[in-house]
């Protein structure tokens, strides 16, 4: 029998816009955990570091719930990046005008699964 158990982790209100995180999330979707971490560590972006923390948290959750699980058995199943809260502020401009400054954040959802063969 083929056993697939799934484990999740979420990062909420992370200080980076979803537009910047989504291309990085596309690079690791469907990959083994060790390969995904290697890809994220080699990227110089701040977003890669944030995404790496959530991926490591999901893998840690998987290894906590199943002590016999090794890193080689963990695969990335789902990576979703959604809009988080927006912090709006005012940016003073010339001649008494003002522009609106919007600082975006994102929610990252990572789901990993274990690939292993088990008995009944």
Curated annotation (Swiss-Prot):
GO terms for molecular function: rRNA binding; structural constituent of ribosome. Pfam families: Ribosomal_L22. InterPro entries: Ribosomal_uL22, Ribosomal_uL22_bac/chlpt-type, Ribosomal_uL22_bac/org-type, Ribosomal_uL22_CS, Ribosomal_uL22_sf. GO terms for cellular component: cytosolic large ribosomal subunit. GO terms for biological process: translation. The keyword Ribonucleoprotein applies. Residues 1-20 are annotated as: Disordered. Keywords: Ribonucleoprotein, Ribosomal protein, RNA-binding, rRNA-binding. HAMAP family: Ribosomal_uL22_B. This protein binds specifically to 23S rRNA; its binding is stimulated by other ribosomal proteins, e.g. L4, L17, and L20. It is important during the early stages of 50S assembly. It makes multiple contacts with different domains of the 23S rRNA in the assembled 50S subunit and ribosome. The globular domain of the protein is located near the polypeptide exit tunnel on the outside of the subunit, while an extended beta-hairpin is found that lines the wall of the exit tunnel in the center of the 70S ribosome. Belongs to the universal ribosomal protein uL22 family. This is Large ribosomal subunit protein uL22. It comes from Borrelia turicatae (strain 91E135). The lineage of its organism: Bacteria, Pseudomonadati, Spirochaetota, Spirochaetia, Spirochaetales.
